Amino acid sequence: MKEHEVLANAFAMPLTSPAFPRGPYRFVDREFLIITYRTDPDKLRAVIPAPLEFDEPIVRYEFIRMPDSTGFGDYTESGQIIPVTFYGHKGNYSHSMYLNDEAPLAGGRELWGFPKKLASPSLTRESDHLLGTLDYGPTRIATATMGYKHQPADLEAVKKSFETPNYLLKIIPNPDGTPRICEIVQYPLIDVTVKGAWTGPGALALTPHALAPVADLPVLEVISTIHILSDLTLGLGKIVHDYLKK
């Protein structure tokens, strides 16, 4: 393979059989269980990378079921999203993400900088409630429950919430371990259709784990719980802050 051929095909690793395809990345029947909770402000401050900031010590714990995603297949994800501001503009910062599928794990980290790790999340219907669980190895580190479709949510308000910018901290090292890329990436969710959304009673329990520290942002008070069914496209990102150019 000639040098120009290498460059022409240098989309993802491995060169001759990339772990994920080129986009667009469309998700059909993407289902969310989101529990919004209040946490310790000092602990939250310790994990949000400047120049991102927070107004209120709020975390959204999410379980996401993705049965039909272009190029990524059928998988489930779980993690923590933090409402932030970026120079005064409201957004969402992805703090932790755990999933059970290699293609979106590799693609999420390499393309956008999603903080993805391999684990075993699930989102299921259990009689009269939704059940979200996250296992890291044999250890259960997160359990969420929600009463099933108790009250309809405002679909227009839910769709509007998908327009909020999303932020990631992307880090890729040089071969010697020093940072080659260290930047804040912003990405959108586009072509969103909200098929249904419901609220209801919710509960969330987090268990400490050395390598999956979701409990480091403790649950002090559950504020709200929502269940969403949607179709959407995960848009590509742009660099909005480069730590290495300061």
From Swiss-Prot:
UniProt keyword Nucleotidyltransferase present: no
Lyase recorded as keyword: yes
Single GO MF annotation: acetoacetate decarboxylase activity
Enzymatic reactions: acetoacetate + H(+) = acetone + CO2
A Pfam family recorded for this sequence: ADC
Record InterPro entries: Acetoacetate_decarboxylase (IPR010451), Acetoacetate_decarboxylase_bac (IPR023653), ADC_dom_sf (IPR023375)
This protein's UniProt keywords: Decarboxylase, Lyase, Schiff base
Catalytic site positions: K116 (schiff-base intermediate with acetoacetate)
EC number of this enzyme: 4.1.1.4
First-level EC class: lyase
HAMAP family in alphabetical order: ADC
Family the UniProt entry places it in: Belongs to the ADC family.
NCBIfam families in the record: PRK02265.1
Purpose of the protein: Catalyzes the conversion of acetoacetate to acetone and carbon dioxide.
Protein's recorded name: Acetoacetate decarboxylase
